[in-house]
Amino acid sequence: MLPTFKRYMSSSAHQIPKHFKSLIYSTHEVEDCTKVLSVKNYTPKQDLSQSIVLKTLAFPINPSDINQLQGVYPSRPEKTYDYSTDEPAAIAGNEGVFEVVSLPSGSSKGDLKLGDRVIPLQANQGTWSNYRVFSSSSDLIKVNDLDLFSAATVSVNGCTGFQLVSDYIDWNSNGNEWIIQNAGTSSVSKIVTQVAKAKGIKTLSVIRDRDNFDEVAKVLEDKYGATKVISESQNNDKTFAKEVLSKILGENARVRLALNSVGGKSSASIARKLENNALMLTYGGMSKQPVTLPTSLHIFKGLTSKGYWVTEKNKKNPQSKIDTISDFIKMYNYGHIISPRDEIETLTWNTNTTTDEQLLELVKKGITGKGKKKMVVLEW
Amino acid sequence: MLPTFKRYMSSSAHQIPKHFKSLIYSTHEVEDCTKVLSVKNYTPKQDLSQSIVLKTLAFPINPSDINQLQGVYPSRPEKTYDYSTDEPAAIAGNEGVFEVVSLPSGSSKGDLKLGDRVIPLQANQGTWSNYRVFSSSSDLIKVNDLDLFSAATVSVNGCTGFQLVSDYIDWNSNGNEWIIQNAGTSSVSKIVTQVAKAKGIKTLSVIRDRDNFDEVAKVLEDKYGATKVISESQNNDKTFAKEVLSKILGENARVRLALNSVGGKSSASIARKLENNALMLTYGGMSKQPVTLPTSLHIFKGLTSKGYWVTEKNKKNPQSKIDTISDFIKMYNYGHIISPRDEIETLTWNTNTTTDEQLLELVKKGITGKGKKKMVVLEW
């Protein structure tokens, strides 16, 4: 059983909250960005009776959130005096899932109802908070159908994986058409394989060499719908490319799209496996190495290399995010996309008992902790 | 005075030739590709009275011609028995300028006249020859207005430089709009600067560091129309990029296009200087290093990286080559593009006195020789 939203619903729903608490920052620090965070209790300046008030259910701690604290992320919120600070400050966090606990009487509430679960339409709204206040329903997307973990991560990983598959290639689902991607164990890559499978597109996922390769590959293939998983050493092996790859791909295979979130040699090797005049999209650079492309791929094979940035794409075209979430939810309801909960380690913020000091420590642990993706889940 | 075509016109024009002589190859050899070349005398199989017969005036020895002999070039002519060889063979060379010496009576001659100077529309026709035979005027482009050196090189370097500037960006010639390119001393780069200048686009040309930097930069700026020349060390210098570059570019500058024929660090450094959502076209890889692109340029700056290949582009769309040559000739006639003769070392093939052995040595020298671009000029 997935945790239902009910479990997180407060008995005090439908009331205007009084105690606002947010994780805020005024400055940036590259080395140890947890230093710039503090917990701030404040009274919002808005007239809450005329606002959409949201109770936070969960927020993930994403790499981009951390990069924002470090001051190295190109997209950032405006810092304001809204939280009664001495210096202009912003609330950390860019995505999360919320429950509507109070609505205005006018048209600005749109079709929202009390108890609806929503996510912010845009990044930079600040999500590391117990409550948030919005003025218009058009800045929110309803996600009642999604479980907690899917809803809290759909804006970044969900949209990224979905749009990478859906928005660039005019696929023929009757053909033998493939995506090749590196970092095949990442959260986004798992969305990619599931969305691709649902659309009749095959995926070749490259993962790092490891002792339990077969076991990991089996999970990616059986649970997440990867068509075939290969290792980075196979990816980089010219003999493999010549002799084995064509058997994996089958007859009349077209490898039309490469998805790169690693860079360096891995990016060159997935690009080499593309058909002529194909596309590589880069959306991450885990290896810290630049994207590396043999000149001949550009000149003689017509390769196009572009970037994908979920924040900018959906800022430019908010409707595309609304449409993506709608399609994502349909696929989720059909069982084509499973919850990412197994990939996530939850950190519990009990809004009744967790002290400010404990909350700060909790979030710092989420920022610095290794292993699974971290998500703060609020208990009410 | 540029050498005129008159000088190369034969007294025997308007006659059907009897002695065909071509540099041909049947096999390939990477290490020393001159080994596969031989001089072949033959009688063409076509009915020459029903053909367009061309006398060769000059042909350059291009890197792509050499790569074809090596067997490492993705575009290659079909090998045939047309030249009375034991093994199927092809004539070397992909561009050159010819004079029409015999025409058929029918419509296949189009608007060609005896004495017209022409170039082949497509690559892979074989140009290292004293005569060539074509069946239709639609396979030829008239270039009567160009001097020998411009005409013999317009298919590769001329088209490349012209199309790189003209075919990808919708320029605003009233704006402060820039192209940045590396290998600023190359033949193509010199076409780029001249075409750009004629179109009201500014060029920032990067050249390798050298003792006589100022002298070389001055020639590129004064003679070839580069707006500003900088060194690779300046290109790679972050302080230069921050403090000096904006002064060079001026107010409201837009660096909209990067042209890369070097690769490696140089490609990363020119790409960094582009505005957001800009384009880098790679058309060569002199450093033998792959195209290297910081991940952030793709993701956060919206960089698109593509390739340019003159052969494929004009094969796909022959009309675009015809249009390019037409525009090139107009610009040449206005004096916006000068002859590349100063960049070229000529090797003379006297069709009356040069023996086959001497001819082969001449061409081998052209293939292996360092320094200036080599062109074989035929004397009749």
Curated annotation (Swiss-Prot), chains A, B:
It is an enzyme of class 1 (oxidoreductase). Residues 1-9 form a transit peptide. GO terms for cellular component: mitochondrial matrix; mitochondrion. Induction: Positively regulated by the zinc-responsive transcriptional regulator ZAP1. Its main location: mitochondrion. It comes from the Eukaryota. GO terms for molecular function: DNA binding; enoyl-[acyl-carrier-protein] reductase (NADPH) activity. It is found in: Mitochondrion matrix. The modification Phosphoserine is found at S339. GO terms for biological process: aerobic respiration; fatty acid biosynthetic process; fatty acid metabolic process. Its EC number is 1.3.1.104. SUPFAM superfamilies: GroES-like, NAD(P)-binding Rossmann-fold domains. The active site is at Y73 (proton donor). NADP(+) binds at residues 157, 185-188, 208-210, 283-286, 308-310, 373. It catalyses: a 2,3-saturated acyl-[ACP] + NADP(+) = a (2E)-enoyl-[ACP] + NADPH + H(+); (2E,4E)-hexadienoyl-CoA + NADPH + H(+) = (4E)-hexenoyl-CoA + NADP(+); (2E)-hexenoyl-CoA + NADPH + H(+) = hexanoyl-CoA + NADP(+). Keywords: DNA-binding, Fatty acid biosynthesis, Fatty acid metabolism, Lipid biosynthesis, Lipid metabolism, Mitochondrion, NADP, Oxidoreductase, Phosphoprotein, Transit peptide. Present with 1560 molecules/cell in log phase SD medium. Belongs to the zinc-containing alcohol dehydrogenase family. Quinone oxidoreductase subfamily. Catalyzes the NADPH-dependent reduction of trans-2-enoyl thioesters in mitochondrial fatty acid synthesis (fatty acid synthesis type II). Fatty acid chain elongation in mitochondria uses acyl carrier protein (ACP) as an acyl group carrier, but the enzyme accepts both ACP and CoA thioesters as substrates in vitro. Required for respiration and the maintenance of the mitochondrial compartment. Homodimer or in a complex with other proteins. Interacts with ARS1. This is Enoyl-[acyl-carrier-protein] reductase, mitochondrial. It comes from Saccharomyces cerevisiae (strain ATCC 204508 / S288c).
